């Protein structure tokens, strides 16, 4: 059993070093907002997970009321992940978060078609799919769970008081997957974890989670210095090394100026930086 959290920009600035030391073993991160824009801290959170080798997955809180709307939401998620360098991989799971009241106003067949459309788009883009719901609407078949033989992540909060990361309720409260595999249980929305200000959702997952990877181009963002980028792609960033790289990339008289470093970062982002 792994102890983890799920987060969005509501958690604000996170100290990932403290989070890691607190025992967090995985993090599930919100991808996009209602208007399909990236969560404003998505890149920052992915960076933190990568730096401290915390396995991660993603979720999309769904609002779509039609299959076409679901495909639009899924495409926005895929585009966002590609933009930050989280390239398609079956080790990267995107969970459809189905809990909005407007969706539950749909009939079960209609909402099932919505979720199926989202799933198909995620899978066809090369990622893995999972379904997140609260226990009650899942069991009452707001979505026809018999059609989702997938990773199932269910929410059930037995207690309303603040909880520590490893204060997991006993298994008598654990929800059950009616179909597919119960991979995770969100057991509290009032978690207290070092490194996070305020409450955070607490989860336990069963089995292993892969440490996610991002492409080298992700590191060529304003959040990273050239030295950090070179370290991330396994190149020792001494001044002599950077001078050699500059020569190889036709950047003359390298002295480490901002302009020269930005040129290298641009080449790295485009996958054109020669490092030898």
Predicted stretch roles:
Residues 1-119, 123-126:
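Substrate-binding cleft of extracellular glycoside hydrolase catalytic domains
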Residues 1-9, 147-214:
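Functionally critical loop-and-helix segments that line ligand-binding/catalytic clefts
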Residues 88-171:
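Catalytic domains of cell-wall/extracellular-matrix polysaccharide-remodeling enzymes
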Residues 207-220, 272-276:
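Low-complexity, Pro/Thr/Ser/Gly/Ala-rich linker/spacer regions in secreted
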Residues 215-236:
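Extracytoplasmic/periplasm-facing segments of secreted or lipoprotein envelope proteins
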Residues 241-273:
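Short, Lys/Arg-enriched alpha-helical microdomains
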């Amino acid at each position: 059993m792994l102890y983890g959290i799920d987060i969005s920009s509501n958690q604000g600035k996170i100290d990932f070093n403290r989070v890691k030391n607190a025992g967090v073993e995985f993090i599930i991160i919100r991808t996009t907002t209602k208007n399909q824009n990236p969560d404003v801290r998505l890149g920052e959170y992915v960076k933190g997970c990568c730096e401290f080798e915390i396995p991660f997955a993603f979720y999309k809180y769904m609002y779509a009321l039609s299959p076409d709307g679901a495909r639009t939401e899924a495409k926005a998620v895929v585009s966002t992940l590609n933009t930050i360098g989280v390239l398609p991989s079956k080790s990267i799971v995107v969970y459809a978060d189905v809990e909005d009241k407007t969706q539950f106003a749909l009939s079960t067949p209609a909402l099932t078609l919505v979720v199926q459309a989202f799933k198909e788009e995620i899978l066809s883009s090369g990622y893995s799919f999972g379904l997140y719901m609260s226990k009650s609407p899942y069991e009452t078949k707001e979505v026809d769970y018999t059609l989702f033989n997938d990773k199932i992540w269910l929410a059930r909060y037995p207690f309303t008081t603040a909880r520590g990361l490893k204060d997991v309720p006993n298994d008598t409260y654990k929800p059950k997957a009616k179909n597919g595999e119960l991979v995770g249980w969100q057991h509290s929305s009032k978690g207290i974890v070092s490194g996070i200000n305020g409450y955070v959702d607490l989860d336990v997952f069963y089995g292993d989670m892969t440490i996610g990877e991002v492409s080298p181009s992700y590191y060529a963002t304003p959040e990273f210095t050239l030295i950090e980028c070179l370290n991330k792609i396994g190149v020792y960033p001494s001044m002599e090394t950077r001078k050699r790289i500059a020569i190889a990339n036709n950047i003359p008289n390298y002295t480490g100026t901002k302009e020269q470093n930005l040129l290298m970062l641009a080449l790295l982002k485009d996958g054109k930086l020669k490092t030898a």
